[in-house]
Amino acid sequence: TVEHPYGSSAFLNAFLGGNNVLNQQYTGERYVWQPYRSVENFFRSGSVSNTSLNIRGASEDGKISYNVNYGNLDEEGFTPGNGLKRNNLSVGGRAQLSNKFTVQGSMNYSNTSFVSPPVAASRGNGTLGWSTFGNVFFTPRNVDLMGLPYTIPENGGSIYYRNGNDIINPNWSVANAQGGQTVNRINSTTSLTYEFNDNLSLTYRYGLDWYNERNKEYSN
């Protein structure tokens, strides 16, 4: 065994003059020096669920037809706090009118939402940014990532094995920080055709492409 990383932490020894819960709890504690499965236990098995529904129909004479499509994608990434959700709705139709006019149109609406814990380049020392992946992979094998407390009780901040607490605990990142993006988009086309005769027609087309994107980054 070796001295517990929180018991020998210069950061905890100095924080509030050493009068803090973790310093008092782990000072003098011993820590089993052995390999831990920190990387394997931090990540999880991902999953993907895809659902689709289609409805279509037409009149007996074939002059009117329609179709409706709905799709749902729910993806859970192998990194905790990472996921993607998407909903799509498409509607289309065509009507051949008795006065030589034909109207047809389609509309597609999609909503996509993506979330992820902080990701950045990493040197394992916090100087290039805040990287959940980097902080996991730079964790030594003899440090039990999943067995160490990750929150400082007094202020809710991150605590990790480094003597100076100079990188963010990946478990704290997942619980307290997130980046995300939500995108809404609408595409639609409409056309109106007038047939003068079998060889001549006039068509008017209108298209719309509307896009809205919102990004968020937060940390407690």
Q: For the regions a protein language model found, what residue spans apply to each?
A:
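Short coil/turn segments at secondary-structure junctions
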Residues: 39, 173-177, 192
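Repeated loop/turn-to-beta-strand initiation elements of outer-membrane beta-barrel proteins
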Residues: 61-66, 100-103, 199-202
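Residues on the lipid-exposed face of transmembrane beta-strands in outer-membrane beta-barrel proteins
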Residues: 53-57, 91-95, 188-194
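Short beta-strand-initiation
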Residues: 48-50, 88, 187
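Short strand-turn segments of transmembrane beta-barrel domains in outer membranes
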Residues: 1, 23-54, 69-79
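Surface-exposed loop/interface segments of Gram-negative outer-membrane beta-barrel transport/assembly proteins
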Residues: 1-33, 77-82, 88-185, 203-220
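Outer-membrane beta-barrel channels and translocator barrels
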Residues: 48, 60-62, 96-98, 195-197
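A generic beta-sheet turn/junction motif
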Residues: 57-63, 72
